[in-house]
Amino acid sequence: RVTVLEAERIGWGASGRNGGQAIVGYGCEQDVLERLVGEGEARLLFDFSRDGMTMLKRRIERHAIACDWRDGYASVAIRPRQERALRAWVDEMGQRYDYPLQWWNRDQLRQQLASDRYLGAAFDPASGHLHPLAYANGLAAAALAAGVVIHEHSPVVELRRGARPQLRTAHGSVTADFVVLAGNAWLRGIAPELESRVMPVGTYIGATMPLGEERARSLIRNDMAVSDVNWALDYFRLSRDHRLLFGGRASYSALPPPGLRGVMTRRMHRVFPQLCDVALEYVWGGYIDITRNRAPHWGRLTPNVYFAQGFSGHGVASTGLAGE
């Protein structure tokens, strides 16, 4: 029997609060993986990420998860240097990894995205976006139907390792043959050697009021997800009820940035000045865990204690793959 110990509620953390972008690949560039593990293993890892995207779509279909999946993701360049790097990346992924990204110049991008801020885009038709909390809850429902036991509000306070590891909570314990640690930024002392490998980073997102279908689709005509390539990036997409969801800003503090709603609204207006009469109706945030090089970190602590963390903002598809 599989038992899940959840410190809060299903989807309380990054799995429910994230921006909803499901992207093939990882938080680092492929050349980082090549330096870490070699070209052959880097190719294998990239193919794993493609498999993770296929797995995500199959799970949505198999379990009839109503999470508003939409195809298409664009990584956009603001500065000429970024434009050159993105275009070279499109060529490299096609030639060396057999991955068919599309390069859009400024005019081609402008046909789909009503913003003059960007110089070009790498468009990935295989990636896309979804409602993250609906997806997380759908996976939980499928797990329950398969016989998994889920205990919410059950934070683990101690992991006792051994032939049969034990996880203690404030109200009881679970003894298991195998343990998977998937707490990301919230391990809270149960595996210090893992916590030292990642850093929690706050990221924030807001939603406008419903704009109406015509106005919303005038912003992103093909309904793709979009992200720029800055370190503290902007990312955005449309929701099923025709809101613009606009995220970005990074915080390395335990507190959200002051004046967050105003800051996020100004960032949105910088991309879409035609929304100068629109503010963000809701703003929320949460913490992702990133590694120093943004490469994912998963493996085993002991022969029967596994871990998966450090997805660095690219966990929607690749976490499912890591679990598999």
Regions found by a protein language model. Give the residues of each.
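General small-molecule cofactor/ligand-binding pocket signal
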Residues: 68, 102-105, 149-151, 281-283
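Conserved mid-domain beta->alpha element of the FAD-binding
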Residues: 303-324
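Hydrophobic anchor at the start of a short beta-strand
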Residues: 2, 101, 278
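Active-site substrate-recognition segment that forms the wall
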Residues: 22, 54, 58, 62-70, ...
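Helical element adjacent to the flavin cofactor pocket in flavoenzyme catalytic cores
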Residues: 84-95, 116-178, 182
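Mid-domain beta-loop-alpha active-site segment that forms a flexible
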Residues: 110, 123-140, 263-267, 315, ...
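Glycine-rich FAD pyrophosphate-binding loop
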Residues: 2-17
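Dinucleotide-binding Rossmann-like beta1-alpha1 core, especially the glycine-rich loop
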Residues: 25-106
